[in-house]
Structure formats: C-alpha cells, structure tokens
Amino acid sequence: MSEDSSALPWSINKDDYELQEVIGSGATAVVQAAYCTPKKEKVAIKRINLEKCQTSMDELLKEIQAMSQCHHPNIVSYYTSFVVKDELWLVMKLLSGGSVLDIIKHIVAKGEHKSGVLDEATIATILREVLEGLEYLHKNGQIHRDVKAGNILLGEDGSVQIADFGVSAFLATGGDITRNKVRKTFVGTPCWMAPEVMEQVRGYDFKADIWSFGITAIELATGAAPYHKYPPMKVLMLTLQNDPPSLETGVQDKEMLKKYGKSFRKMISLCLQKDPEKRPTAAELLRHKFFQKAKNKEYLQEKILQRAPTISERAKKVRRVPGSSGRLHKTEDGGWEWSDDEFDEESEEGKAAISQLRSPRVKESLTNSELFSTTHPVGTLLQVPEQISAHLPQSAGQMPAQLTPVSLPPAAELAPVQAAQAQSSGAGSQETKIPISLVLRLRNSKKELNDIRFEFTPGRDTAEGVSQELISAGLVDGRDLVIVAANLQKIVEEPQSNRSVTFKLASGVEGSDIPDDSKLIGFAQLSIS
C-alpha cells in the first residue's frame, strides 16, 4: 500500500471494491474478500441482508459507532460501512489465516481429531487472546454477543482477533439494545447462547459472553458445540432445563477427551454456570491456571496455520449469470452466483444460465435461521450517498394470528391458532394434516388453575407462533415464551412418547410462594387431550 493511498479515507462507494471469493456465510450474511482500488488493499466485506435482520437502523447506527471506536490488537479492525440495495456492507481487515472453525473443519475432515481436535497449549493460546479482546470490550461497556470458533480469526503471523463485534453479533440477538422486549429474533442456532439470553426475562450483561466462551472452549477440543446435533428449539430446551454442559456432553467417543486435564475442565465449568453472577469476568479468567499453558503467536503459526486450509481452499468462487442484477445466491453445490431475485428459467437469461450448468438455488427456510420474529418493521434509513441508499423493506417476521377472544374461566377454550408460515412447502401443503388437541394447565395472575385448550396442526402451525399467540391473548406470561414453545415442540415432534410434560416457568413464583411441580406452583403442564 503506497503512502498516498494510505492517507485516503475508506470509500463508501461499492464500485471502489472489486468483490472476489466468498470466504464465509451465515444465516443472514455473506463474507467476501474484496480489493479496495483507491486504497490498494485487500479487505473483507461482510454483506448483511437487512430484510432478515428486523432491526431499526437507529439501533444499527449505534452499534456501528461503537465498532468504529474500538481499537485493540485482538479485535478485527473495522474500516467503514454503507448500504447497497437491501444489504449493509461492513468493510473490515482481512485476516488470511481464516477462522478457527475453518481449521477445526479441516482437521476433522482429514481424520486428525481422534484424540481431540486441538491440544491444550493451542486452545490456551487462542483463548487467552480472545479473553484479552473480551476484557477490552467489557471494560468499554460492550458485549460481543456471538463468541464462537467461527468468529475467532487468525492472521498469517499467528495473531488472534475476534470478529463480528458489533452489528452482526447485535443482529444475532434480535437487535434489542434495551433488552426489555419479550419478542426477539434469534438468528442461527443458539448453541453458544447463555440461558439468561434465551429466557429474556431480566436482560443480560457481559457475563453472557463468558458462557459463550465456555462453549467455545468445548468446541475447540471436540470440534462442535455440545448440542450442535439438535434443532434450535431443542437446544433452547436442553440449555434451560438440563445441568450445564461439560466437555463430555454429546461426545460419543469419550477416548478422544482423555488428554484434556483438570484445569481445562475446571475452567469450562466456571464459565458454564447458569447463574451469571457466579461466572468469572474475563480479567479473572486470564489469571486461571489453565492459561499458564498458553504460548506465543509463533507457536500458532507452527502448530495450526501450517495445517490450516489456504484462503483459496476455503473460498467459494462466484459465478456470474449473464445480464443479472447482481444479487448473491447460494447454490446447491455450495457455490455462489449473481442473479436476480425472481429468476425466470424460461427467459433468455435463465436459458443462458442453464446452458452454463448453473446449480439450482437453495430454497431459503426460516425454520433454522429465525426462531422468534418481531412484528415491527425495520426503522429509519441509514444515511448514505444517494447512489447507494436503500429503502429497507418491512420486517420478514411472523404476522399476528387471529384468535377468538377468550376469558379465563377454569376451562378456557382457544380457537385453532393460525401461526405464521401457515402453509409449508412440498407435500405437506397438499396433504390433510390431523390437528393435535392440547391442553396447557397453569395458574393465572389470581393463582387459579386454568386449562387452556387449543389445536396444533403440523405443517401449518409452529411452536413459536402458537406460543406467541397465547401470550398475545393474555393467556401466558410473556417471560414464558421460550419454555412454552420448547415444550410444545417436544410434544408435537414425538406425540406418542411425550403425551404430557411438566416444566418450570421462567416467570417463577411471587412473594412467599414455594415452587411445587405437583401443585403447578411456578410450573405448567402441557398434555395431549
């Protein structure tokens, strides 16, 4: 980079960036390498789909401001951001070593994980640097919100930096800075999410990052988060109802864990305490005995960067469909292409694409990327140059269902709930689904037992949609959204083996009441009637 170009400000014109290979993707974003021609520097651009984020731009601007003021050797440098059509482009430093997740996948694919994926010294070295970054954020009043191996990046010199601080991590928790709303959107799987973030009862603070850090420690040793095999609703239920996970949770071959010692396991258990007040701070963790095993960045260069996939191996080339408007879509073979949103395969453009053996597009599904949706639209616009300004669309969230008005006598009758995403695609929309009749028994605000009867039609209704409508009708406390939805999902997935479940409510008990599962004080019972 020349002296003249280094003095230039970072451009907010998309034409100044030559987009190159896709180097990462998630539920709402794609990361591409790019070359900034005025600066003569290669960068990473995270392209966030604003249609899926359901967050006001006022709140996003606050997060961007926080990112721009963040300067630390263990935090990825943020350069600038701007809006292109319905995407927010975040321009950041490119770290050529890729993410720790890339390395984990590479090691597992080569079958080199039979005695654990990364050794203790490597894990300690990486996580010590992550803690340094987290300590900086927490001291400055920031919460990362999305600590995981996929967001820990490596430089070619063995340096370790945390990515996704700010906007994209902010979106992953629903974009609610105040933490005082019942409904939010969780993007992606909540495997790394702290219990208090899931419950959304009392809000959360930087200790949520410490829980995620503990899950990440397990991920670096075993190759995956403890509940990675389960769908999102099941992950929520397991995290909230079970004891905290450990190194062994979900691991079939316990032999692979033998080399991990007591100090590593103790450090994990300290992080994974359900009561956030009992978790250590980042500064306290840095003094833990386990981190005495940490080495320098040259050690990482030697131990894992030489085993890591190259940027070309990680990258997915982008195919360009002739005449396309320039929107990225993932194809079934794992590649990426530029094309129009409404792609007509009978058109000249479509025939040209097919003649080039273009892969079919992957059909998008909300079920694994959005659990709970807000009903409010995206807010004010981000002010950007006219040529790249974008009118953001309405929220893609669930529309409220129509419920028959009900009172709360001992046997309140609830009309069948018309949940969001009422018609599923494929065969399910053509077959007649048999509704499941259910009864939710719990105490109302007057401490009287009530039976709330309703029907759930598989393929039409969703557990989260039904739970939201029970709350909207005033039948269920808003704080119990997650736990009711999780147990409803449990029953409808396996109605034969789960005809009745009793579970603890997040709303708890009042005053001097003592929780009692048999009397349903602080508990609820959901049954097939």
Curated annotation (Swiss-Prot):
> What Enzyme Commission number does this protein have?
2.7.11.1
- Determine the domain of life of the protein's source: Eukaryota
Question: Cellular location of this protein?
Answer: Cytoplasm
Zinc-finger: present as a keyword of the record? no
Q: Catalyses which reaction? A: L-seryl-[protein] + ATP = O-phospho-L-seryl-[protein] + ADP + H(+); L-threonyl-[protein] + ATP = O-phospho-L-threonyl-[protein] + ADP + H(+)
Q: Which residues carry this modification: N-acetylserine?
A: 2
Where ATP binds, per the record, is at 23-31, 46
SUPFAM superfamilies linked: Protein kinase-like (PK-like)
Q: Which cofactor does it need?
A: Mg(2+)
How does it get modified post-translation? Phosphorylation at Thr-185 by WNK kinases (WNK1, WNK2, WNK3 or WNK4) is required for activation. Autophosphorylated; promoting its activity.
InterPro entries of this UniProt entry?
Answer: Kinase-like_dom_sf (IPR011009), Kinase_OSR1/WNK_CCT (IPR024678), Prot_kinase_dom (IPR000719), Protein_kinase_ATP_BS (IPR017441), STE20/SPS1-PAK (IPR050629)
Residues bearing the modification Phosphoserine: 324-325, 339, 347, 359, 429
Which residues does the record list as Phosphothreonine (modified residue)? 185, 310
* Keyword match Zinc-finger: no
- Active site per UniProt: 146 (proton acceptor)
Which Gene Ontology molecular-function terms are recorded?
Answer: ATP binding; magnesium ion binding; protein serine kinase activity; protein serine/threonine kinase activity
Specify one Pfam family. Pkinase
Q: Which GO terms describe its biological process?
A: cellular hyperosmotic response; intracellular signal transduction; positive regulation of T cell chemotaxis; protein autophosphorylation; protein phosphorylation
State the residue spans of region: Disordered.
315-360
Q: What is a single cellular component term in the Gene Ontology annotation? A: cytosol
**Comp. bias (Acidic residues):** 334-348
Q: Which residues form the Protein kinase domain?
A: 17-291
> What is stated about the way this protein's activity is regulated?
Activated following phosphorylation by WNK kinases (WNK1, WNK2, WNK3 or WNK4).
Task of the protein: Effector serine/threonine-protein kinase component of the WNK-SPAK/OSR1 kinase cascade, which is involved in various processes, such as ion transport, response to hypertonic stress and blood pressure. Specifically recognizes and binds proteins with a RFXV motif. Acts downstream of WNK kinases (WNK1, WNK2, WNK3 or WNK4): following activation by WNK kinases, catalyzes phosphorylation of ion cotransporters, such as SLC12A1/NKCC2, SLC12A2/NKCC1, SLC12A3/NCC, SLC12A5/KCC2 or SLC12A6/KCC3, regulating their activity.
What's this protein's family per the entry?
Belongs to the protein kinase superfamily. STE Ser/Thr protein kinase family. STE20 subfamily.
| Name listed for the protein in its UniProt record | Serine/threonine-protein kinase OSR1
* Organismal lineage: Eukaryota, Metazoa, Chordata, Craniata, Vertebrata
